[in-house]
UniProtKB/Swiss-Prot annotation:
Protein name: Cytochrome b559 subunit alpha
Binding site for heme: 23
Any one Gene Ontology BP term: photosynthetic electron transport chain
Molecular-function annotations in GO: electron transfer activity; heme binding; iron ion binding
Family: Belongs to the PsbE/PsbF family.
Localisation per UniProt entry: Cellular thylakoid membrane
Organism: Cyanothece sp. (strain PCC 7425 / ATCC 29141)
Keywords: Electron transport, Heme, Iron, Membrane, Metal-binding, Photosynthesis, Photosystem II, Thylakoid, Transmembrane, Transmembrane helix, Transport
InterPro entries: PSII_cyt_b559_asu, PSII_cyt_b559_asu_sf, PSII_cyt_b559_CS, PSII_cyt_b559_N, PSII_cytb559_asu_lum
HAMAP family for the chain: PSII_PsbE
Phylogenetic placement of the source organism: Bacteria, Bacillati, Cyanobacteriota, Cyanophyceae, Gomontiellales
Gene this protein is translated from: psbE
Transmembrane segments: 21-35
Membrane-protein topology: Single-pass membrane protein
Primary site of residence: membrane
């Protein structure tokens, strides 16, 4: 016969009023905090990703695609010269 770990059964936890009082506040708060984190642009600053209007410069409006694998380094260097 299996022993007990002494922990409360999951069904007891999710049917308790205390669980729902705590989670009815924390779950919406986490959602709102995440939404604000992204909508204010702080996520772009924290993770260092470019904002949607910063992906391409005014000079270069296309993707820098490497077309020849043997001359890839040369193509990358040409792309970097254009960016500067």
């Amino acid at each position: 016969m299996a022993g007990t770990t002494g922990e409360r059964p999951f069904s007891d936890i999710i049917t308790s009023v205390r669980y729902w009082v705590i989670h009815s506040i924390t779950i919406p708060a986490l959602f709102i905090a995440g939404w604000l984190f992204v909508s204010t642009g702080l996520a772009y600053d924290v993770f260092g990703t470019p904002r949607p209007n910063e992906y391409y410069s005014q000079v270069r409006q296309e993707l820098p695609i490497i077309s020849d694998r043997l001359e890839g380094k040369q193509q990358i260097n040409e792309f970097l010269k254009e960016v500067k």
